[in-house]
Design a protein with these regions (language model features):
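Surface-exposed loop/turn motifs in large extracellular/passenger domains
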Residues: 1-10, 19-37, 45-63, 71-97, ...
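Beta-rich catalytic cores
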Residues: 15, 40, 66, 101, ...
């Protein structure tokens, strides 16, 4: 979808307020997902190998119990990129919130690859103000940040990023040219 807005959609007792993708492929370019709400993935859920390729798109004020904007599970993959130049280029996660984990993104047993120009700012959750990563039993979560900015995100634990692994699970992370600025955690 190019130039598309998903606004104020609600999944009352389930996942993916805006989009539910189980094994499908989503492409978002120059779009907006704002004020969507769900139990998991206020804007989007990726499960069963579902993928999302996101370029120059804004996720703002989405809310969920887990994953204010994205809930990623069962080999789901989120990739962001910048297709333009200037201050508005890149993908923006702004003011998303989760009552429990992952203000912007919750990933368990999946992959998050945030490319150059991706900004996560003002997101909030109890654990992982911007991102919560969980390596579930005998599975893994993979995080890659390249040219990513984390600013003014907040949480009780992990103002920007919180990761945890269950027995037999792993969380793998790689980062280059990343800026963490003004993120806060009240308990560590």
């Amino acid at each position: 979808a190019t130039g598309t807005t998903f606004r104020k959609n609600v999944a009352t007792s389930n996942y993916g307020g805006g989009i539910y993708s189980a094994g499908g492929s989503i492409v978002l370019v120059d779009s907006r997902m704002e004020e969507n709400k769900a139990a998991g993935g206020g804007a989007i859920i990726l499960a069963g190998g579902g993928t999302a390729s996101v370029t120059d798109t804004a996720f703002a004020a989405n809310t969920a119990t887990n994953g204010g904007a994205f809930f990623i599970d069962k080999n789901g993959v989120l990739t962001t990129a910048s297709g333009g130049v200037g201050t508005d280029a890149g993908t923006l996660f702004d003011g998303n919130s989760a009552t429990t984990n992952g203000g912007a993104v919750y990933v368990q047993n999946g992959t998050v690859d945030l490319g150059s120009g991706t900004r996560l700012q003002g997101n909030q959750a109890a654990k992982g103000g911007a991102i919560y990563a969980l390596g579930g039993k005998d599975a893994s979560a993979k995080l890659t940040f390249a040219g990513t900015v984390f600013g003014k995100n907040s949480g009780t634990y992990g103002g920007a990023v919180y990761s945890s692994a269950s027995v037999g699970g792993t969380v793998n992370a790689a980062a280059s040219d990343v800026v963490f600025e003004g993120n806060t955690a009240t308990s560590g």
